[in-house]
Amino acid sequence: MTGMSNVSKLAGEPSGQEFLVFTLGNEEYGIDILKVQEIRGYDQVTRIANTPAFIKGVTNLRGVIVPIVDLRVKFCEGDVEYDDNTVVIVLNLGQRVVGIVVDGVSDVLSLTAEQIRPAPEFAVTLSTEYLTGLGALGERMLILVNIEKLLNSEEMALLDIAASHVA
């Protein structure tokens, strides 16, 4: 699905759509608030051997084994630090619960269809299929992410394997 068709899908929603705003480095991103289960501080995780660097490991969340993905590593943010501002956004993605590590969470914004622009097309070296679009609030730009497309099916399979090794 292209960014344009995602925008037209939102056009039928008169009150807009709410996004949880989080930061990675100096950039602000937004994900559909309805996917968010909870926000937690970053705790140490159980590392799983032979998984990509962006899969930090798993944690036990009230009896549920939750794979933890560091989006800063996935987006090649360079050296990442874990400090008091580092948080895990726990997402409910259909039949899966996944945690994503981000630099911080700032607020929840409601965007109307008019405030959401199609995702720009970049060179073939940069995949933009996971972008829903760009949210424009005056001078502020928000990169809207489709988290299911960001974590492709191959990566989701790795997360399932990681979680099953601990369960």
From Swiss-Prot:
PROSITE patterns per UniProt: CHEW
One GO BP: chemotaxis
SMART domains: CheW
Keywords: Chemotaxis, Cytoplasm
GO annotations of cellular component type: cytosol
InterPro entries: CheW, CheW-like_dom_sf, CheW-lke_dom
Residue ranges occupied by any CheW-like domain in the UniProt entry: 16-156
Gene3D superfamilies recorded: CheA-289, Domain 4 (2.40.50.180), SH3 Domains (2.30.30.40)
Principal localisation: cytoplasm
Domain of life: Bacteria
Signal peptide: none
Matching NCBIfam families: PRK10612.1
Protein name: Chemotaxis protein CheW
Species this chain originates from: Salmonella typhimurium (strain LT2 / SGSC1412 / ATCC 700720)
Gene: cheW
